[in-house]
A protein has these predicted regions:
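Acidic, PIN/NYN-like endoribonuclease modules and their adjacent C-terminal/linker elements
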Residues: 1-5, 114-144
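Active-site neighborhoods of divalent-metal-dependent phosphate/nucleic-acid chemistry enzymes
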Residues: 2, 75-123
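Histidine- and aromatic-rich ligand-binding microenvironments
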Residues: 8-9, 44, 106-107, 128
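A generic structural signal for short hydrophobic patches within well-formed alpha-helices
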Residues: 13, 48-51, 85, 131-132
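Residues that scaffold the ATP/ADP-binding catalytic core of kinase and kinase-like folds
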Residues: 15-17, 54, 88, 134, ...
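General small-molecule cofactor/ligand-binding pocket signal
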Residues: 42, 78, 140
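Short, hinge-like loop/turn segments at secondary-structure boundaries
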Residues: 58-62, 95, 141-144
Length: 144
């Protein structure tokens, strides 16, 4: 049986997938590449939106923006579905009662990413500690 696809967050995708040429071979980058080796990588719709927002906010030119769009096109984007919406609503509620940081409005984007992983059973690879102890979410390192 093949392993499920891995959902990566915006930071991991930007570091591992985006061919920016500025990333050194840091221990974190090498670790992430090792964890993703042989696995299908997917992103949440929220991640695609964050990537494009970052480019627009930084006033990227047409050529650089085209390069980003081409890189995004190499990674399947998981759309927001009824299951993701349900997972998001339940997750935010559980986080509120548990006092988890994903309950906060300023972490709504992270909650959408987590909900995508929960709804589809994808483990999440992230460098962001906010996802630790998220109800119903498996982090890739914990799944190994």
């Amino acid at each position: 049986m093949s392993e499920p696809a891995v959902l990566v967050d915006t930071n991991v995708w930007s570091t591992v997938i985006l061919p920016a040429g500025k990333h050194n071979q840091t221990p974190e980058l090498l670790k992430w590449r090792g964890l993703l080796l042989g696995r299908e990588v997917v992103i949440a719709a929220q991640t695609e939106a964050e990537l494009l927002y970052g480019a627009y906010k930084a006033s990227w030119g047409a050529t650089r923006l085209l390069g980003l769009r081409q890189a995004i096109a190499t990674t399947p984007t998981i759309p927001v579905t009824a299951d993701v919406i349900e997972a998001f609503a339940r997750l935010r509620t559980e986080c509120r009662f548990a006092g988890h940081a994903l309950q906060a409005k300023d972490h709504m984007g992270d909650a959408w990413i987590a909900a995508t992983g929960i709804a589809h059973g994808f483990p999440l690879l992230t460098g962001d500690s906010i996802f630790g102890d998220t109800p119903g979410l498996t982090l890739l390192e914990d799944a190994s």
